[in-house]
């Protein structure tokens, strides 16, 4: 699973995702993409599950780019622990995703195969998404 090799701080504030994506909202690598339509934290496990769903459906053909990276440590206190006594230990890593952000890109496969692969990937994610395709001119 994805996670940073090292970080400046062990724990992070919860934070909020305001407004639309300020970058990463255009296709840069592939012909097809999966765009987020809602703000949400996507965990490293969800990213990995989506990646596996895509690559298995495409039968290892084509190329996949993951455009988001889980760089935010999410901490959690153990169950049945009283309030207070400090913040919990880091439990997992997440990526903050704003609406409009391209999360995955595909290339080297037909459009119908790419659409189905990204539909399967979207089923693993907790947000509404949209399939996008590069416009030929």
Swiss-Prot record:
Keywords: Ribonucleoprotein, Ribosomal protein, RNA-binding, rRNA-binding, tRNA-binding. One of its GO terms (cellular component) is cytosolic large ribosomal subunit. GO terms for biological process: translation. It comes from the Bacteria. The keyword Phosphoprotein does not apply. It holds the Pfam family Ribosomal_L16. Gene3D superfamilies: Ribosomal protein L10e/L16. PROSITE patterns: RIBOSOMAL_L16_1, RIBOSOMAL_L16_2. One of its GO terms (molecular function) is rRNA binding. Binds 23S rRNA and is also seen to make contacts with the A and possibly P site tRNAs. Part of the 50S ribosomal subunit. Belongs to the universal ribosomal protein uL16 family. This is Large ribosomal subunit protein uL16. It comes from Beijerinckia indica subsp. indica (strain ATCC 9039 / DSM 1715 / NCIMB 8712).
């Amino acid at each position: 699973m994805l996670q940073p090799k090292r970080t400046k701080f062990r724990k992070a504030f919860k934070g909020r995702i305001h407004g639309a994506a300020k970058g990463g909202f255009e296709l840069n690598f592939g012909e097809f993409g999966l765009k987020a339509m809602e703000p949400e934290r996507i965990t490293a496990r969800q990213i990995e599950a989506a990646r596996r769903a895509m690559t298995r459906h495409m039968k290892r053909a084509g190329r996949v780019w993951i455009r988001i990276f889980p760089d935010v440590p999410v901490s959690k206190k153990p169950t049945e622990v009283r309030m207070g006594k400090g913040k919990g230990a880091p439990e997992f890593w997440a990526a903050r995703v704003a609406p409009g952000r391209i999360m995955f890109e595909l290339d080297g496969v037909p459009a119908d195969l790419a659409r189905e692969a990204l539909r399967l990937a979207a089923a693993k994610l907790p947000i509404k998404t949209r399939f996008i395709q590069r416009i030929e001119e």
